[in-house]
């Protein structure tokens, strides 16, 4: 019962935390405020009904959830040529720590190396443009496009509201 309760609490927090954020304090405590008055109109029952629908439950029966380092995961599932992978890794910024686990530049290098040199599947990545990230993926056979994104939320001015992103593919 406890894992089910944890799943339910996680679902609730993701849906009702401010701007869908999920972060922890340096002490390991969840520290995102409630979403505010606009969230009062969110219909939790409607969302729960969708998650109980036959179509989605059928899909979930074929779904496996992993909690692994990305490289362990990819080496476990061994994506093939007819697979497609969408990647949304943490940004190359000072604020890239989730649940007290940093995603470092070494992790960014490992990810780029695996995706460019070992991954047989087609893949697409969206990530904030930095010189470091651009340099990792500016390789033959890799396509890089840019697009601008304006965020509504920027906590304590840690993140720029206007950001250029990279859309990176191997096809």
Where does each model-flagged region fall?
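SAM-dependent nucleic-acid methyltransferase catalytic core
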Residues: 1-86, 90-96
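Long, positively charged, glycine-interspersed low-complexity recognition regions
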Residues: 92, 104-171
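Short glycine-enriched, charge-decorated loop/helix-capping segments at active-site entrances
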Residues: 98-102
């Amino acid at each position: 019962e406890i894992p089910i309760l944890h799943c339910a609490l996680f679902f609730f927090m993701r849906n009702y935390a401010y701007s869908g954020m999920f972060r922890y304090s340096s002490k390991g405590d969840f520290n995102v405020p409630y979403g505010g008055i606009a969230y009062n109109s969110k219909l939790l029952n409607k969302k729960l009904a969708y998650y109980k629908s036959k179509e989605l439950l059928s899909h979930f029966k074929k779904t496996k959830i992993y909690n692994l380092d990305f490289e362990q995961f990819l080496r476990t599932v061994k994506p093939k040529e007819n697979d497609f992978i969408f990647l949304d890794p943490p940004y190359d910024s000072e604020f890239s720590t989730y649940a007290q686990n940093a995603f470092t530049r070494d992790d960014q290098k490992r990810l780029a190396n695996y995706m460019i040199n070992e991954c047989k599947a087609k893949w697409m990545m969206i990530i904030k443009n930095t010189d470091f990230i651009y340099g990792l993926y500016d390789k033959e056979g890799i396509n890089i496009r840019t697009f601008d994104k304006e965020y509504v939320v920027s906590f304590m001015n840690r993140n720029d509201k206007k950001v250029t992103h990279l859309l990176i593919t191997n096809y």
